[in-house]
Amino acid sequence: MNKTWWKNSVIYQIYPRSFADSNGDGIGDLNGITAHLDYLKELGVDVIWLSPVYQSPNDDNGYDISDYQAIMKEFGTMEDFDRMLSEMHKRGLKLVMDLVVNHTSDEHHWFMESKKSKDNPYRDYYIWKDPKDGKEPNNWGACFGGSAWEYDQETDMYY
C-alpha cells in the first residue's frame, strides 16, 4: 500500500517569533530557523509547519495578513526565506506554510479598497452590515474582547 507522505511524517510546528533569534533583536527569524535545520533533522523531523511569516501589522500574532507576497520585516527578507527553503530541501525536509485565507488584515489592499464605496469590486470580499437601530448589527463578540464589529463612517456600515 502506498501511503501519502503526511501520514507517516514527523511534523514540527515553528512559531518563528519565539523559535530562534539570529540577530539579537529578541525576535525569532527565518535565519534563526535556517541555523537550526540540522538539529531538527537529527530529531527526526520530516516536515516543518511554519506559522505565518507574511507581512502583517501583527494585531493577531501574524494571522492578520496585509500582504501575502511579502515577509514581515522582523522575520527577514524573501531572500532569507528562499535560502531557508533551499536549505530545507538539501536536508530532505518539507515545508508546510500556515496560509490564512479566511480573513485578512484591515491593512490589506483588498480591504482598504472595499472601504472606499459600497459598489467597490472588493466590497463583497468582506462582510458589511447596516447599523441596527444606530448600533452594531448584532451582539457578536470579538475573540479579543468587545464587539466583533467596527463602524465605517465613510459608508455608514459595520464590518
Label every model-predicted segment.
Residues M1-Y159:
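Acidic/aromatic-lined carbohydrate-recognition and catalytic surfaces
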